[in-house]
Amino acid sequence: MVKARRQAKILELVRTRVIETQEELAAALAAEGIPVTQATISRDIKELQLTKVPMPDGRYRYALPEEPGAAAGERWRRIFREAVLTIDHSGNLVVIKSLPGTAQGVAAAIDHAGWPEMIGTVAGDDTVIVVVKPADATGEVAERLKGLMR
């Protein structure tokens, strides 16, 4: 595999999953059909300037270099605070209403939070749907998201 493609896949994995160790990253790459050695992973992490940031539960995960030290950086919190109008939930879904044209930015902010209970977001023009797993965590996730509005 070409180095650039492998590193692009690493960035995608770190952006979309909670990766806590080099071993987890290697396993995720292998599952995508990209076998790598620990030495290669280590070099890629250094070249991509990935860092480890704390999660709300005290564990650490790999993060992209533009993410400040917290799982949801101040830039993302500001976008969230300025754009979100309401947050509600039902079943395993959290529905977020935002200013027209801002849902994509709100969804990106949520995705950057890296909370393991949130398995994905779907954004329209002014609405974001967050899919939560397990369903009984939906209320807690909605409250945590409301906390970002403050």
Swiss-Prot record:
Q: Where in the cell is it found?
A: Cytoplasm
Known pathway:
Amino-acid biosynthesis; L-arginine biosynthesis [regulation]
The UniProt entry, under InterPro entries, shows: Arg_repress, Arg_repress_C, Arg_repress_C_sf, Arg_repress_DNA-bd, WH-like_DNA-bd_sf, WH_DNA-bd_sf
Major place of residence: cytoplasm
Keyword terms, alphabetized: Amino-acid biosynthesis, Arginine biosynthesis, Cytoplasm, DNA-binding, Repressor, Transcription, Transcription regulation
Q: Name one GO cellular component term.
A: cytoplasm
- Give GO MF terms, alphabetically: arginine binding; DNA binding; DNA-binding transcription factor activity
| Annotated S-S bridges | none
GO term, biological process aspect, one: L-arginine biosynthetic process
| Superkingdom field | Bacteria
Q: What does this protein do, in the record's words?
A: Regulates arginine biosynthesis genes.
The text of the family note is: Belongs to the ArgR family.
PANTHER family in the cross-refs: ARGININE REPRESSOR
This one is known as Arginine repressor
The top of its lineage is: Bacteria, Bacillati, Bacillota, Clostridia, Eubacteriales
The UniProt gene name for this protein comes to argR
